[in-house]
Regions:
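Walker A (P-loop) ATP-phosphate-binding motif of ABC ATPase nucleotide-binding domains
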Residues: 1
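Hydrophobic anchor at the beta1->P-loop junction of P-loop NTPases
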Residues: 4
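P-loop (Walker A) phosphate-binding loop of NTP-binding proteins
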Residues: 7
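Conserved substrate/cofactor phosphate-moiety recognition/catalytic segment
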Residues: 10-57
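Loop/turn-to-beta-strand initiation segments
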Residues: 55-62, 81
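A short acidic, amphipathic alpha-helical/loop segment
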Residues: 70-74
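Conserved phosphate-donor/acceptor-positioning beta-strand/loop module used by diverse small-molecule
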Residues: 78-96, 124
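Small-molecule kinase domains that catalyze NTP-dependent phosphoryl transfer to phosphate-bearing small molecules
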Residues: 98-159
Length: 159
């Protein structure tokens, strides 16, 4: 399972969609679960859905995961890798303003300020790379993790 997390507007959903497309093109079954909601109940529901997904292929979960308790809940599910997607606050605010389902700007500020960084297996700064490059990096990491599940465990790959 791959959890793509970060503040609103960082690019998580765009990147997760690109990753799903790349893997699907390669014949890998992919389940993508997404939520923009910030409630504990939502994360419990996401965890239940992700845990019940078939074990073949890749399960992608896209959400802020800005609270450590939500990260811990997902880590308890087993073989889970966290990809932390970051961007500057200015970038997150601008992207939020330009998307169809923008959240309240105050919400972006709160999540950005209160975001508890996960012990990420891969970190991507979307101020430094585009979604296509970010997706390529994640797919490469997924392939590495599949070949050697212990690889880079607990140590972030900064790309």
């Amino acid at each position: 399972m791959i959890v793509v997390c970060g503040p609103p507007g960082a690019g998580k959903t765009t990147i997760a969609t690109h990753v799903r497309h790349r893997l699907t093109q390669r014949g890998v079954p992919v389940r993508l679960f997404h939520s923009d909601d910030f409630s504990s109940r939502t994360y419990e529901q996401l965890a239940d859905q992700a845990a019940s997904a078939p074990s073949d292929g890749v399960t992608l979960v896209d959400g802020t995961f800005y609270r450590r308790e939500w990260q811990t809940r997902f880590r308890a599910l087993g073989d889970v890798r966290f990809v932390s997607v970051t961007a500057s606050l200015a970038t997150c605010l601008e992207r939020n303003r330009n998307r169809a389902n923008a959240i309240d700007e105050q919400g972006v500020h709160v999540v950005y300020r209160e975001f508890e960084e996960p012990n990420a297996d891969l970190e991507i700064d979307t101020d430094q790379c585009d979604p296509t490059t970010a997706a390529d990096r994640i797919v490469t990491a997924i392939e590495t993790w599949a070949e050697d599940p212990a690889s880079e465990s607990g140590r972030p790959l900064r790309r």
